[in-house]
């Protein structure tokens, strides 16, 4: 009966802006388990995939390599660069990359009343598969704790925090779209991500 009550309360928290059942799936590890099953690889050259998450926005502003995506956002400057390659290590040119992240207070632009997009952008890799952009250092942030999932975390002694990260979606002709995240290596929540 307690389990039925918990699931009922979880369902009652769901609406067009909040999906408590998805949050429950995330915190129980089911979401990532399904993603891992659907994107199995033993190749160390292949980046680990993840789910899209609730803060992706299609068609972000396009920027050139090396430009800033931190329009009107305060925070510690952070330079991101990398190289996209295939499983043989060959560089991939013209890969379309969407990036998005939280600000230094742990909020995404869609959670604030901003007039335009911020801390999200689209760009393409160069002939050597390279990309680069300036942003601000993202911050860890808590998932919602005002519902049944928050109570579950509390009674099981788990914190509600996600480690600081930047989301990436990479799209290239002839390849499966990759959604992944890059985490700050020294984040205190890196080994205990709430989701």
What are these model-predicted stretches?
Residues 1-195:
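Beta-strand-dominated extracellular/periplasmic modules and repeats
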